[in-house]
Amino acid sequence: MRIVFIGPPGAGKGTQCELLSKALKVPHIGTGGMLRALEPESGEQIHLRIDRGHFAPDDFVLQMVAERLSQPDSRTGYLLDGFPRTQVQASAFDKQLVAASLKLDHVLHLQVSADVLIERLRKRGETENRADDSEEFIRERFRIYEDRTAPLLDHYRCQGLVRDIDASDSESLVHASICECLNFTLASPAES
């Protein structure tokens, strides 16, 4: 299964991808983590952009994702978290899929109220010490999401791929909603 997760910062994309990855036995490919893991000398400018709440350049992300998707564990499917984030990335990814005779199965849109998101991001910033979760950057990240990523929903709705998920509940309830949406029966996360 090939699934893209779209949602604002703090919606739980990474958490839900991890849970679903174990169940489906496909890799969770999170571009945010991949970008944060770049060596400082090779990714200094990228880190500065991310620390300011901005996206990495499209061409850089497209190359990074293409390299990751070429690995053997991605052949049967994958869960994309943080990609695509822009119309340029989505259009280029569509072309890559067509060239490989592949298609996306779903785009899961994790929806959460602004109040819930702000609280989640504040807590995550305290526990994970992520510069991009500091209160100073939260609103800027929301603005960027609304301007550049949210419009991708229309792109994928036209393809009939978007499934809206209420992600304001607990981790386990959101996971159950995703499984129901995918018509997929799973053991609870505690059992896996």
Swiss-Prot record:
Region feature NMP, mapped onto this chain: 30-56
Reactions listed under catalytic activity: AMP + ATP = 2 ADP
PROSITE patterns given in the database record: ADENYLATE_KINASE
EC number from the UniProt entry: 2.7.4.3
Cellular component terms (Gene Ontology): cytoplasm; cytosol
Source superkingdom: Bacteria
GO biological process annotation, one example: nucleoside diphosphate metabolic process
Pathway assigned to this chain's UniProt record: Purine metabolism; AMP biosynthesis via salvage pathway; AMP from ADP: step 1/1
Location(s), subcellular: Cytoplasm
Binding locations of AMP: 31, 36, 82-85, 89, 130, 141
Keywords carried by this UniProt record: ATP-binding, Cytoplasm, Kinase, Nucleotide biosynthesis, Nucleotide-binding, Transferase
Enzyme class: transferase
InterPro entries the record matches: Adenylat/UMP-CMP_kin, Adenylat_kinase_CS, P-loop_NTPase
Binding positions (ATP): 10-15, 124, 169
Coiled coil: none
GO molecular function, one term: nucleoside diphosphate kinase activity
Annotated region described as LID, given as residue ranges: 123-133
Domain remarks in the Swiss-Prot or TrEMBL record: Consists of three domains, a large central CORE domain and two small peripheral domains, NMPbind and LID, which undergo movements during catalysis. The LID domain closes over the site of phosphoryl transfer upon ATP binding. Assembling and dissambling the active center during each catalytic cycle provides an effective means to prevent ATP hydrolysis.
Protein name (database record): Adenylate kinase
Naturally occurring in which organism (per UniProt): Rhodopirellula baltica (strain DSM 10527 / NCIMB 13988 / SH1)
